[in-house]
Design a protein with these regions (language model features):
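Extracellular lectin-like interaction modules
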Residues: 1-1005
Length: 1005
């Protein structure tokens, strides 16, 4: 030995340390000092040179102090079984082209803040045990405080089981570490590791574990060093940052941690810093057999990055607030599921301009604290959270140029909003659910994909800003807040379209539910689906200009939720069009405009049923913001007020588009209905039937009104009011009405009040009017027109009054007037017809028939006139004519009832130039009215001219008190035609009162 005994140490030792070709002898050192007790050399020790053959240490142990130990050879440096070399200074072993060969448990220790360097490879050799261990410690406190280890080459062989490198300052790794197929081995790098070359730690033969207790950095050469950590069943743990650039470290090259195989767990504390990547190149961590991949910290990688774990469970564990990111490289979570430990508040995954693919993400508990921030270019997301534990995750923010959703997203914390920004594609049926705590859900971008999308925000607002289902990829279905469940009250906002004008963007589409208290806002212009559209809310706002809804023969429903209201409000100058082909269209609330000076139009079109409440009116109060209204359906159900206004408002901006109402289809009055175009003078047109036991009021101002179908033909309506004086209407618009009722309905309407003294004309184009008490009023002239021209036009009132006021009735050629009011009054101002039409007039009641100052007929207009009444009042003339042959041959005047003459009345059945003189027949008495109408007594005179026609007077004339006439003329015109015999039963009461108190002229020559 050298210096083994106490006090025998050398102060320096040099053995063949001169480099030269002659210094080649092998050197064997049995023992230097006493290991663990005393240093054999207390100073510099230099043994061998680059040409030395081998240096072999004996088994006695070797201890140095006080100076650097340098062992150099051109061949191997060989230590015996379980050798120990210890110093308190630097140690350098340089085997040249050979290796450091050790066996058993080889310990190399420096106890000072010094460096241990092995310049070449380190090779475990078979000493008969086949279990070798390499332990190198440098630094005070057993390497915990300082010290440096530099491994210049590789470590390992098939006999190596364990490698332990410990140093507090740095552990420089210059080559691979390879562990043999020996169970329970370990590779422990205890201290800051520095890669001075590409390093592979290969321990995949058995269950050897790999542990780095501190950082792993690159050296300062400028060349990125690659790192591979490879185990079989053994675990891998890196407790420090890989590429710790945030603390003066240097980024490494590529990283491969059990990417190809290995079932052990992987635990990593981070890669890089928050601002700089910790490596350059590809990063592959884990594989499909990895039992658990544990991540905690920042993982900023510099290349395409893949994370994998066992595909059968939640085996990617995030155990602390964590950021996983790249600047411009893809991040792929390939297999396994991410499991976030309870209490973690923030997880960020950001691939920058690279793509991002995720696996399912879950939480561990119910603390609802984790916020997820997911960003990338093309982002693919699977499940987040769990349907049976929605409170695993707090909030979610996903941002990408494109976002592929292929699963369900559930959140449940106090800030459980879900924000998705980017063009969304549905890769699978997708649920987005924040209903547990009512967080808002916002998709900022378009949504496409032939899958189901179900969004549930509870009491929060659900928003999609972009178009839905465009580009040929319509959704299979769209449900937003459609669950009829307690707490699901949130509104819905769609900022874009569903589909296009030519292609559907979704199949079944359901927005809102009966519990929705919020507003559904639709700001797009096209809502085209291939299935039902169902919208349910307390209010609806359509924000787009010229909004169109379309389906493939499927319904569109705007349904009022339990919160009430349900009005649909259009934006300023935003027209509404709905075309469902054959699907029903239903509005549970009113359709309103926006009061910004520009009226809008409403067009609803289907062969199915259109059901509306008020349009352009909030209840019954007009908003003056709706222009034209066109409702087309197989059936149109009305239940409210339709009110229109001029396009462009009033004043200088007033346009010529007046605000027409056009209703095409069989109308059912589901409630009291008012059509009001009076502020604009727009037209009102019904092209088909009107039924239903409710009142109908039409007020058109100067606009024309057309009821082109039968009113009340199947089910009697309530009261009918059209521009009526009784309702203080003063509009002058013309009115056209087809039949009211038919032969199967006794009364097809209640009271009917049509027109006022300004009404230009009333055209009754049907042939039957079975109605209640009625008044038809038009401006003076022949302006109440009966135009059927195919026979009788019947007014059949069951004990209800009928009045034609303000204007004469004008019969189109071929039209006969037949009216019967039961026991109530029947009043006409006058009746006219076409020249040579010879049409008939029959007015019947057991009450009073009144013919006003317009009289009946002129020239050859009227044929027979029959007036039947409990009393008959004549205020105007009656003129009839006959052709003498055929159906118009006579021209008779028949009075069946007591006649009162009120004014100067002329009855003429002898029209010059006609082929026949009709008869005049009074069935009972004739009396004068004798009442004051203008402050003085009127003159009540009667003139009867029958020519050759028979005159029958069956009762007295002026016999009762006050019944006298003021004049009486009967066939007093001298002429060859005036040949009829005259019989006068009684005039006055002899001896008591005069029947005529004025001129009486009866007969001629």
């Amino acid at each position: 030995s050298i210096g083994a005994a106490d006090g025998d140490h050398l102060d320096a030792l040099y053995i063949n340390d001169t480099a030269g070709t002659g210094y080649t002898a092998a050197i064997t050192i049995p023992q230097i000092g006493t290991h663990g007790t005393r240093a054999g050399v207390q100073g510099i020790t230099t043994i061998g040179n680059a040409n030395t053959g081998t240096v072999t240490f004996g088994s006695g142990g070797h201890q140095f102090s006080g100076g650097q130990v340098t062992i150099t050879s051109g061949g191997d440096i060989i230590t015996p079984l379980d050798a120990n070399i210890t110093s308190d200074d630097n140690i350098k072993l340089d085997p040249g082209t050979g290796s450091l060969k050790f066996s058993g448990d080889f310990d190399l220790v420096s106890t000072g803040n010094k460096t241990i360097e092995i310049a070449g490879n380190s090779l475990a050799v078979d000493s008969g045990t086949s279990v070798d261990t390499l332990t190198i410690v440098s630094g005070e406190g057993s390497g915990a405080t300082n010290g440096t280890i530099t491994m210049g080459g590789t470590i390992g062989s098939t006999e190596l089981k364990t490698v332990s490198l410990t140093a507090g300052t740095a552990i420089n790794l210059g080559g691979n570490i390879t562990i043999g197929a020996i169970a329970d081995g370990t590779v422990d790098i205890d201290g800051p590791a520095v890669l001075t070359a590409n390093v592979t730690v290969d321990a995949d033969q058995q269950n050897t574990s790999i542990g780095f207790t501190s950082t792993i950095n690159n050296d300062g050469s400028g060349t990125a060093r690659n790192l591979v950590l490879d185990t079989g069943a053994g675990n891998i743990s890196v407790s420090g940052i890989i590429g710790d650039v945030g603390n003066s470290g240097v980024a490494i090259g590529t990283i491969d941690i059990n990417n190809s195989d290995g079932a052990g767990t992987i635990t990593l504390a981070g890669i890089g810093s928050s601002s700089t990547a910790g490596n350059a190149g590809v990063v592959d961590i884990g594989n499909t057999a990895t039992a658990d991949l544990n991540l905690a910290g920042t993982f900023f990688t510099g290349g395409a990055t893949t994370y994998q774990a066992d595909a059968t469970g939640k085996d990617i564990d995030i155990t602390a607030n964590t950021t996983i990111k790249t600047t411009a490289s893809d991040i792929t979570f390939q297999t396994g599921e991410i499991d976030i430990t309870d209490g973690v508040t923030s997880v960020t995954i950001n691939s920058g301009s690279g793509d991002l693919i995720l696996v399912n993400i879950h939480g561990d508990g119910t603390t609802d604290t984790t916020d997820l921030d997911i960003d990338g270019t093309a982002v693919t997301v699977k499940d987040i959270g769990l349907s049976t534990a929605k409170d695993e995750i707090n909030g979610v923010n996903i941002t990408g140029t494109t976002v592929n959703l292929d699963g369900a997203i559930y959140t449940g914390g106090t800030g459980n909003t879900i924000d998705i920004t980017g063009a969304v594609t549905l890769g699978g049926n997708t649920i987005i659910d924040s209903s547990t705590s009512g967080g808002n859900i916002t998709i900022t971008g378009a949504v496409t994909g032939t899958r189901d999308l179900d969004i549930l925000s509870g009491s929060g607002l659900a928003t999609i800003t972009g178009n839905i289902g465009t580009g040929g990829t319509p959704l299979a279905s769209l449900d937003i807040n459609a669950s009829n469940t307690a707490g699901h009250t949130g509104g819905v906002t769609l900022g874009g379209n569903i589909g296009t004008d030519s292609a559907a963007g979704s199949a079944l589409t359901t927005l809102g539910n009966p519990k929705t208290t919020g507003t559904i806002t639709l700001s797009g212009v096209e809502y085209n689906t291939s299935d039902d559209q169902a919208f349910t809310a307390a209010a609806f706002a359509l924000g787009g200009a010229n909004v169109t809804f379309a389906t493939s023969s499927d319904p569109v429903d705007f349904t009022v939720s339990a919160a009430g209201g349900g009005d649909v409000t259009l934006a300023d100058a935003a027209n509404l069009t709905i075309n469902t082909v054959a699907g029903n269209i239903t509005f549970g609330g009113d359709i309103l405009g926006t009061d910004n000076g520009e009226s809008t139009s409403v067009t609803l079109n289907t062969t199915g049923t259109v059901s509306v409440k008020s349009i352009g009116a909030d209840g019954s109060t007009a908003d003056n913001n709706i222009n034209d209204v066109t409702l087309t359906g197989g059936t149109v159900s009305l239940n409210g007020t339709i009110s229109t206004a001029v396009l462009g408002g009033e004043g200088e901006t007033k346009a010529t588009d007046l605000g027409d109402v056009d209703i095409n289809g069989a109308v059912t009055l589901a409630g009291a209905t008012t059509i009001d175009t009076s502020s604009s003078g727009g037209t009102v047109h019904f092209n088909s039937t009107i039924n239903g036991g409710q009142n109908l009021t039409i007020k058109s101002g100067a606009g024309r009104v057309d009821l082109a179908g039968v009113v009340g033909g199947t089910t009697a309506i309530g009261n009918l009011v059209i521009n009526a004086a009784s309702a203080s209407h003063t509009g002058a618009g013309a009115i056209y009405i087809d039949d009211i009722g038919d032969t199967d309905v006794t009364a097809a309407a209640g009271t009917v009040n049509v027109g006022n003294s300004n009404t230009a004309n009333i055209d009754l184009t049907g042939d039957i009017y079975r109605i209640g008490a009625s008044v038809f009023t038009a401006t003076s002239g022949d302006n109440i027109n009966l135009t059927d021209a195919s026979g009788n036009v019947e007014f059949d009132l069951a004990n209800a009054s009928l009045e034609f006021a303000g204007a004469n009735i004008d019969l189109s050629s071929g039209t006969n007037l037949v009216a019967d009011t039961g026991n109530q009054a029947l009043t006409v101002l006058g009746v006219r017809g076409a020249t040579d039409a010879f049409d008939d007039v029959t007015l019947s009641t057991s009450g009073t028939v009144t013919v006003g100052t317009g009289g009946i007929g002129s020239g050859t207009q009227i044929g027979d006139v029959t007036l039947e009444g409990g009393s008959i009042v004549l205020k105007g003339d009656i003129t009839t004519a006959g052709t003498g042959e055929g159906e118009n041959q006579v021209g008779d005047i028949d009075f069946d009832g007591a006649v009162t003459i009120d004014g100067a009345v002329v009855l003429t059945s002898d029209v010059s130039g006609t082929g026949n003189d009709g008869k005049v027949d009074f069935s009972t008495t004739i009396a004068g009215d004798n009442t004051s109408e203008t402050g003085s007594l009127a003159t009540d005179s009667l003139t009867i001219e029958t020519g050759a026609g028979t005159l029958t007077l069956s009762g007295s004339i002026g016999a009762a008190d006050g019944d006298h006439l003021d004049a009486l003329y009967i066939n007093d015109t001298a002429g060859a035609d005036y040949t009829a015999n005259i019989t006068i039963p009684q005039i006055g009461t002899h001896g008591t009162r005069a029947g005529v108190q004025g001129i009486t002229t009866i007969g001629n020559a």
